């Protein structure tokens, strides 16, 4: 962490035991605090996460989705209400199979830079990888096993993930982009940018339909 800014990555998990260590180490390497919400685990995930929590590596909170409620939506509601979110300056939501790759920086603090900021959020392309011609599970490091992906111009590689500033200024988080901004998107310091610093044009056309993909490289 920098002295001035706290970066939080939040995720929901259920029975992700074999993949937890790699994911946690990856995001700690990038400089994130980690918040994990689990539901209905039947493997050793909760024991492992509790051990990480006892060591101070992350915060683990259980949650129970309501009947008929998608687990991810329950997770995101749990996250937005958690004290770690209110204490964070920047929040990123990622699943356990999603790894943020920084090409020109070693940490998220180096990429975002010091305050003051003239942008509200930064978006990253969500690149999809295939199964590497494997037809069954094999133990190993995820980011080294699956290295083949679709070309960048394909539609499924146009989706985004978002790290956002002042998360409590939104009604709720989203898998790709948050919902219900309380501020004014037209304000100069509420831009949405790419990692290169370019402003993303027309990133939100209607209040209830936030961006999920971009046509920019």
Predicted segments — roles?
Residues 32-40, 61-65:
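Short beta-strand/loop segment that forms part of the nucleotide-sugar
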Residues 5-11, 26-28, 33-37:
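Hydrophobic targeting segments
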Residues 88-101:
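Short beta-strand-to-loop acidic/aromatic patch adjacent to the donor-nucleotide binding site
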